[in-house]
């Protein structure tokens, strides 16, 4: 298996795209991470993870570092602020264009973790993707309505409370310094994500464009949405299932909970759904077969 780092030079920033492949003419997969993380949710320094797994099994894999995350520079700071729409109006189109310049066409499959699914769907609401064959969500939700102690502590107190205070006072969210996440977030990006997470309506914060209504009018590709049985707050099954309903609940959508009760090896949570050492011999195999079909 080969890997390489590709860079997209913009006027005031650089985007990083990590590629894993065993053969260049393989079908392509585009992977997008979520909030307070970077593309390494899909791979490790030692070459393990979902992205290398796909490459070893016949796919040409491209992993995004959205603006300011991972090797995309500069990182967020008081002087480097940007909003959430930068991800789906600028970064994702740039990544897709880069993949097209290499492959000759747009990526065949799109995969997301957590909030990355919202970015991809927001992009699709306003753009066509005629070459797109399928999508996979790992723990992707758009809003959080579940009520339990973990949600109260992690989402309400930590995210909406303490992290909002940090972002406003420091000018960005220093998630790495405070061990809240693996990547820092720009202030406006973080605050705007929170507004969508708390809102019943999926509307643009600038002009009121209704993303859900737009997506419901489209014929979307097959979507496989999975989440961990032990994901109690960030990607709770109830909230992840509701995202599929919000975008039209088409017949070609499939939703699965990954846990012992469903026949899997572990009750996975929001992170180890992608990072657990047993995942490649558990649900990764199922996702692989789904992509190949």
Briefly describe each language-model feature range:
Residues 22-75:
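Short, surface-exposed "cap/lid" segments of acyl-processing enzymes
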Residues 225-227:
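Short beta-strand/loop motif that positions the catalytic acidic residue
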Residues 232-239:
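Conserved alpha/beta-hydrolase "acid-adjacent" motif
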Residues 101, 105, 111, 115-206:
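Alpha/beta-hydrolase-fold enzymes
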Residues 251-293:
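Catalytic active-site module of serine/aspartate enzymes centered on a nucleophile-bearing elbow/loop
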Residues 229-232, 271:
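Acidic beta-to-alpha connecting loop that harbors the catalytic carboxylate
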Residues 1-22:
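N-terminal cap/lid segment of alpha/beta-hydrolase-fold proteins
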Residues 81-100:
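Alpha/beta-hydrolase active-site loop
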């Amino acid at each position: 298996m080969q890997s390489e780092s590709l860079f997209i030079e913009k006027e005031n920033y650089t985007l990083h795209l990590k590629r894993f492949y065993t053969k260049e003419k393989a079908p392509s997969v585009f992977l997008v991470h979520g909030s307070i993380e970077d593309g390494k949710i899909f791979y490790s320094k030692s070459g393990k993870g979902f992205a290398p797994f796909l490459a070893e099994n016949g796919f040409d894999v491209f992993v995004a570092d959205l603006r300011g995350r991972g090797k995309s520079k500069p990182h967020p700071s008081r002087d480097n602020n940007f909003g959430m729409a930068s991800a789906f109006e600028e970064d994702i189109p740039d990544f897709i264009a880069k993949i097209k310049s290499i492959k000759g066409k747009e990526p065949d499959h799109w995969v997301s973790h957590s909030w990355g699914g919202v970015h991809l769907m927001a992009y699709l609401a306003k753009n066509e993707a005629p070459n797109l064959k399928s999508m996979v969500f790992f723990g992707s939700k758009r809003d959080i309505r579940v009520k339990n102690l973990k949600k109260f502590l992690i989402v309400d107190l930590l995210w909406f409370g303490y992290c909002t205070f940090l972002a406003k006072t420091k000018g960005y969210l220093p998630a790495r310094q405070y061990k809240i996440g693996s990547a820092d977030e720009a202030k406006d990006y973080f605050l705007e994500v929170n507004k969508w997470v708390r809102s019943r309506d999926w509307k643009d914060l600038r002009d009121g464009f209704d993303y859900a209504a737009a997506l419901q009018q489209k014929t979307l590709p097959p979507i496989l949405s999975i989440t961990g049985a032990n994901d109690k707050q960030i990607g709770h099954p109830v909230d992840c299932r509701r995202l599929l309903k919000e975008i039209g609940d088409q017949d070609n959508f499939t939703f699965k909970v990954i846990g012992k009760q469903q026949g899997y090896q572990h009750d996975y949570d929001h992170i180890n759904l992608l990072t657990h050492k047993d995942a490649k011999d558990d649900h990764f195999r199922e996702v692989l077969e789904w992509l190949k079909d």
